[in-house]
Amino acid sequence: TISENYIVIKPKIDTRYSIDKVSTHDRIEQSCLVKETLLSLVEEKEYGDAKHIIIEEGQFFPDLETFVLKAVEGDKKQVTVVGLDGDSNRKHFGQLHKLYPLCDSITKLKALCLQCKDGTEAIFSKRIIEGKQQTSIGSNEKYIAVCRPCFLNNK
């Protein structure tokens, strides 16, 4: 369970819905700390007081692996990382994949395919606008969740 002493962190690059809150696509919001790097948090009071650290959009933090190891193994914190394990080209995205062999557990959540709309689980993000860059912050105006057949049939 999440203790009362927790902090939520999101990357500074993510300004989609709010500058200082994390938000679901349905606009359910939670106050958070905003950082470019995670290690910059270590000297702050909020970090020292927190028992549980929740990292939103973990793929955007360049020091994710180092920070998580320090927090969990060095400082005995509980850490939850939320993020994408792959980009819209099905390539590793950030350092999330480096955490897999270190995790106590991994829960991979799936959406429903927004292309075939038949209840099939979606395991990929498909970019629906032009562009080749890996980092393009967006929501359903740029990406949709799709199943494997829809991803492969409509590249």
For each of these PLM feature ranges, what is it?
Residues 114-118:
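Proline-centered turn/helix-capping motifs that create local helix->coil transitions or kinks
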Residues 57-68, 86-93:
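Conserved ATPase-coupling elements of RecA-like P-loop NTPase cores
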Residues 3-4, 50, 76:
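Short, high-confidence coil segments that cap the C-terminus of an alpha-helix
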Residues 103:
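Short basic (Lys/Arg) and small-residue
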Residues 54, 76-85:
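Structural recognition of the conserved hydrophobic beta-strand(s) that form the central parallel beta-sheet
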Residues 69-76:
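Conserved catalytic/switch belt of AAA+ P-loop NTPases
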Residues 1-44, 87-98, 108-111, 121-124, ...:
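Conserved P-loop
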Residues 47-61:
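Conserved P-loop NTPase "ATPase switch" module shared by AAA+ and STAND
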